[in-house]
């Protein structure tokens, strides 16, 4: 007769209890906690829903990672677990063994089932398993904390699936006892009114990222104000109303409802991203005024900035401490860039990355920016591709970068003299001009990584090299 280890005997005993349906809450109270994960897995795979209901009531761990066990949501399993929780929540005096504080329906903690069950668990002594316990394994003292139910909420359909619908109804009737928590909320298809009702169910402090992409008016942002104002831990907000209009704000922030305006008061943002906002002229000034503290990053893409909009950039304190400024595909050939120069002057001590890409900046406009640019002593990356500048203008630009010793990556356009009628680079012309530009630059400082012309190279596909003297196609 072969000898079985104590842990193996416990496993067999648990399987026998499940098969013969002898499981009771009193028996569970006497079982060692090492047996629970494997028994729970067995009960789940065999669809023993009554056993699941009982095991939840005696669950000896802080967290039950049900989502990583189910993989695909299963309504009857979820119902059994929630019914077990109902029995617990209805008791004024909680059971001696109850430690469960989090029901996790996300697929994020598969290690739990690996550690506490199967070969790994059977190979560990009870002493070794007990060392896995941390301070969090022990119940907190004091008042009962609400049970937390964590989910992933990525709504790609216009209606809720049956599991989420059931869970939301269950949460609704247990307010104060249970918090529905979701770190990241995404809505791609659900109508605005239905989505607002769904947000009412989610514990607002748990939301760290909120992403809404739906075809509706930018002005409807105000309808989310009452919910956004409660999300004290929100760090990223992405709003895309319509196919082209996008507003992205990143950082820890607090919202103050203001239903009379399309934007909200943003107190602690770190990043503002605006892309293809067709009516930005009506909103940019107000948006910058709503930013109560300085931004770290400002990204503005695919739009037209009128003189009035450009003036806004230099007037508001929210842009006074930028580390990154990205203006991409902003048509500027008729725009007065003096306000942009004033902004660069203001952020000269903090700016590390400057992108002026595909803005069609002309020679006369570039000259306006040079005095301020030369003072950006912290600049590490300068991206200036896609602008219409001559060789002389580029030489002047390079001379003004002499004091920018931290520049590690520079990308410049091919001078106008190197372009044919279709705007394509003539590499034979570019090669000697590039040599002139490099000579001009080396007179004021030694560059690190630098590139002139389109990238990647249309002939060889190369990108900016780690070395200055990279291969240049002929």
UniProtKB/Swiss-Prot annotation:
Organism domain of life: Eukaryota
LRR repeats: 97-124, 179-203, 204-230, 231-265, 266-291, 292-323, 324-342, 348-375, 376-400
Paired cysteines (S-S): none
GO molecular function per UniProt: ubiquitin-like ligase-substrate adaptor activity
Gene3D superfamilies: Ribonuclease Inhibitor
GO cellular component: Cul2-RING ubiquitin ligase complex; cytoplasm
Keywords annotated in UniProt: Leucine-rich repeat, Repeat
Gene Ontology BP, a term: negative regulation of DNA-templated transcription
Record keyword Repeat present: yes
Annotated family: Belongs to the PRAME family.
Protein name (database record): PRAME family member 17
Organism (species): Homo sapiens
